[in-house]
Design a protein with these regions (language model features):
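A nucleotide- and high-energy phosphate-metabolite-utilizing enzyme signature
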Residues: 1-193
């Protein structure tokens, strides 16, 4: 807080967390990403166990359909194309939120916490994991530079920041293509995969 960071947080008992998650997809999704930071790790493990028991495979279809409907509504709102001149790296089609949605669905279906667990289960291939990880790292890198250069939580790659971010990420001019063109081409290739 002292640094000006916005931190999403809540304090709940295990029973409250599970109960609220039944009716609120946002809470349920955020609890999928919960992780132990400090305190009694046994309490956290108990929470994870209770959460997974409450939201087992019998609730999976409902969760997947809701997340896909959420994604479709977001895509429609953002123009339903990944090829916009000033893309939204978080909410745009093929962007960070789409990667997160895929992983949330996989976490829900397979009760995993790590992408590599999906490789071990045979759900993903080595190539899938590499593509996903490369895309995720790219988006987070771009997003961090975007927030830093904008001095705020900005998600759109506007024209006035595309050149600066391309320089920060070492996209140099080459014969036939400026660095910013190479950067945006890479962005669109990542969103396509």
């Amino acid at each position: 807080w002292d640094l000006g960071l916005v931190v999403g947080h809540a304090t709940r008992t295990i029973d409250e967390a599970v109960r609220l998650s039944r009716d609120d997809l946002t809470i349920r999704t955020s609890l999928l990403d919960s992780r132990w930071l400090w305190g009694d790790q046994r309490v956290f493990e108990n929470f994870k166990k209770r959460f997974q028991e409450a939201f087992d495979r019998s609730t999976a279809l409902e969760f997947v359909e809701a997340k896909l409907a959420e994604r479709d509504a977001r895509h429609k709102y953002m123009g339903d194309t990944r090829y916009v001149l000033e893309p939204n790296i978080k909410e745009g089609k093929g962007g960070l939120r789409d990667l997160q949605t895929l992983f949330w669905i996989a976490k829900y279906l397979y009760c995993v916490d790590d992408l590599r667990d999906l490789l071990e289960l045979g759900v993903l291939t080595d190539k899938d994991v590499r593509l996903f990880t490369r895309a995720e790292n790219f988006f987070w890198g771009v997003r961090c530079h975007l927030h830093y250069n904008s001095n705020r939580a900005e998600e759109r790659l506007t024209f006035n920041v595309q050149s600066e971010i391309s320089r920060c990420l070492n996209y140099a001019d080459r014969s036939g293509a400026q660095g910013v063109e190479r950067f945006m081409k890479h962005y669109f290739l990542i969103t396509k995969d």
